[in-house]
Amino acid sequence: MLFGTYEHCMDAKQRLTLPAKLRNKLSNPIYLTKGYDADLEIWSKDDFLLKIKEILNQQNDQKDIRNIERIIWSNTVEIDIDNLGRIKIPYNLIQNLNIGKDVFILGLGNRLEIWSKNKYNQHKNQFIKNLNS
């Protein structure tokens, strides 16, 4: 199980070191994809395929299924964790989500999320504000 919040920095080559507690629970290859919010998600192969199957099984319309498949598969890359515990994040995923050098890595049970530090703080604060309203 993946859990916790970790603050890390991406290097100039768009590499991010995963916390040892998290990377020891993952094996190559892993799947990096756009999340539902302004984040990236990291999945193990088995969990990623289960999630895709679950999403597609909820759809009845073939057109919707094709569109969902396009969005998911075109925004997913298979990557490996290198021997130093780093992943290289493709530039297009960083640019599309405006993820900067400073990030949070969140463990969410069966996946990791990578957030821009500023965006995550804004997202979290807005959620807390809405809860208190």
Curated annotation (Swiss-Prot):
Main location as per UniProt: cytoplasm
Alphabetic keyword roster: Cytoplasm, DNA-binding, Repeat, Transcription, Transcription regulation
Residues making up the signal peptide according to the UniProt record: none
Alphabetized NCBIfam families for the sequence: division/cell wall cluster transcriptional repressor MraZ
Alphabetical list of HAMAP family matching this protein: MraZ (MF_01008)
Organism: Mycoplasma mycoides subsp. mycoides SC (strain CCUG 32753 / NCTC 10114 / PG1)
Subunit structure: Forms oligomers.
Protein name (database record): Transcriptional regulator MraZ
Subcellular location: Cytoplasm, Nucleoid
Molecular function GO labels: DNA-binding transcription factor activity; transcription cis-regulatory region binding
InterPro entries, per database record: MraZ (IPR003444), MraZ_C (IPR035644), MraZ_dom (IPR020603), MraZ_N (IPR035642), MraZ_sf (IPR038619), SpoVT-AbrB_dom (IPR007159), SpoVT-AbrB_sf (IPR037914)
Similarity annotation: Belongs to the MraZ family.
Gene it is expressed from: mraZ
Domain SpoVT-AbrB: 5-47, 76-119
Keyword DNA-binding in annotation: yes
GO cellular component, one term: nucleoid
A GO BP annotation: negative regulation of DNA-templated transcription initiation
